Regions:
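N-terminal secretory signal peptides that target proteins for export/translocation
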Residues: 1-8
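Patatin-like phospholipase
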Residues: 2, 13, 24-81, 93-312
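Alpha-helical transmembrane segments
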Residues: 8-15
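Gly/Ala-rich beta-loop-alpha elbow adjacent to hydrolase catalytic centers
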Residues: 83, 87
Length: 312
């Protein structure tokens, strides 16, 4: 038998040992996968961003407070508030942190003369500074971007006719601009531009709410309806014309809202503060009637999001 030198034997043994260790390092035993492990649960979708859009309508705007009370009583809190004209007043106060009952208390205690700083007619009978000061005092002089809720206020550029959205800056000034009915309030001058009532171009600013990222939009329409009775004079004819024009614009925007709330306030006078309590009551009624539709829209949102997550 051939004798293998001892050194060669030791070298062979070392080589075999190295290869064996290398095999252990590069080829670990396969992991055992249980067939009973459940599929990973998808992350729940984020809650929908709910926007409350408050339209214009002068003294009928008190109905917005009733709608807010109804929504609050059933746990609905909007993430985004958008207001135009009278709706901007309520939207600003609500965005500042006032609840529905607090808004009602403020509404019933306010006096019309507090907003009526009459002046010699030049380009309007009312300056609007009193309204601006009232709002700023009520919100603690906070600018729009520092309010409790996201707020957007719509006005109209008097020179270009463009829709302008205030998302920052002086809250009272924005509300004043949005509420400056041409011929009644003086136009609001700001940054070398002049602004008037937002209801001229967007009586119920649904599109603005969608642009701000709202998933579910609740729009409150308090616009006047055309009168079916005989129009007595020139003023009646002019007002009827404006009502028809505003109604057409409002209908186009409302078509893109998820929930439309329309309080029964046709019998109330837009210029009469004395009917404010009745307006609030009618707003509450309409808000309650809209709750089921709102719940359905929120459920549909979650259903769509969950279906999207499964596909991904």
């Amino acid at each position: 038998m051939v004798q293998v030198p001892e050194k060669i034997c030791l070298a062979l043994r070392a080589a075999i040992l190295v290869f064996a260790l290398a095999g252990c390092a590069t080829a670990p035993p396969p992991a055992l996968i249980s067939q009973d492990e459940p599929a990973p649960v998808p992350e729940p979708p984020p809650p929908p961003k709910i926007a409350l859009v408050l339209g214009g309508g002068a003294a009928k705007g008190f109905a917005h407070i009733g709608v807010i009370k109804s929504l609050e009583s059933h746990g609905f809190q909007p993430d985004i508030l958008v207001g135009t004209s009278a709706g901007s007043v309520v939207a600003a106060l609500y965005a500042a942190g006032y609840g529905g009952f607090e808004l009602q208390r403020i509404a019933l205690a306010m006096e019309e003369k507090a907003f009526s700083d009459w002046t010699i007619p030049n380009r309007g009978f009312i300056k609007g500074e009193a309204l601006q000061n009232f709002i700023n005092e009520a919100v603690g002089n906070r600018p729009i971007e520092q309010l409790t809720r996201k707020l957007a206020i719509v006005a109209t550029d008097l020179q270009s006719g463009e829709l302008i959205v205030f998302e920052r800056g002086d809250t009272g000034l924005a509300v004043r601009a949005s509420s400056s009915v041409p011929g009644v309030f003086q136009p609001v001058k700001f940054n070398n531009r002049e602004y008037v009532d937002g209801g001229l171009v967007s009586p119920v600013p649904v599109k603005t709410a969608r642009d701000l990222g709202a998933d579910v939009i609740v729009a409150v329409n308090i616009s006047d309806r055309p009168k079916l009775s005989r129009l007595k004079d020139t003023i009646d004819v002019m007002m009827q014309t404006f009502t028809i024009m505003g109604g057409i614009i409002a209908e186009k925007e409302l078509a893109f809202a998820d929930v439309v709330v329309e309080p029964d306030i046709s019998a109330l006078n837009s210029a009469n503060f004395e009917s404010r309590n009745q307006a609030i009551i009618e707003g509450e009624k309409a808000g309650l009637q809209a709750l089921m539709k709102l719940k359905e829209k929120i459920a549909a949102y979650y259903e769509a999001k969950n279906a999207q997550a499964v596909q991904e």
